[in-house]
From Swiss-Prot:
<feature type="domain" description="Ig-like">
    <location>
        <begin position="5"/>
        <end position="99"/>
    </location>
</feature>
<dbReference type="InterPro" id="IPR013783">
    <property type="entry name" value="Ig-like_fold"/>
</dbReference>
<feature type="disulfide bond">
    <location>
        <begin position="26"/>
        <end position="85"/>
    </location>
</feature>
<keyword id="KW-0393">Immunoglobulin domain</keyword>
<dbReference type="InterPro" id="IPR003597">
    <property type="entry name" value="Ig_C1-set"/>
</dbReference>
<keyword id="KW-1015">Disulfide bond</keyword>
<dbReference type="InterPro" id="IPR050380">
    <property type="entry name" value="Immune_Resp_Modulators"/>
</dbReference>
<protein>
    <recommendedName>
        <fullName>Ig kappa-b5 chain C region</fullName>
    </recommendedName>
</protein>
<dbReference type="InterPro" id="IPR007110">
    <property type="entry name" value="Ig-like_dom"/>
</dbReference>
<dbReference type="InterPro" id="IPR036179">
    <property type="entry name" value="Ig-like_dom_sf"/>
</dbReference>
<dbReference type="Pfam" id="PF07654">
    <property type="entry name" value="C1-set"/>
</dbReference>
Amino acid sequence: ATLAPTVLIFPPAPAQLATGAVTIVCVANKYFPDGTVTWEVDGKPLTTGIETSKTPQNSDDCTYNLSSTLTLQKSNYNSHNEYTCQVAQGAGSVVQSFSRKNC
């Protein structure tokens, strides 16, 4: 069985909210190369403004650490509420999200 990755999502830092653009970061540990990362905003898939990078393979278990960064204009960020990062791997997926109004 494939191990599920550990996924964390980080909302924009308060200092960023004073600038023109904000970033949301999704980090996955124990990530296998065949996995996929998708972003949703208010339940709708998002495909722009995303930059994903992997660290070198861990020789112990053949997994990677993955970082996916979503960059948005502040006005766009403020006009939506729920931000979701989904890491799918094998038969399972891990979803992390946050609501802007709860931050």
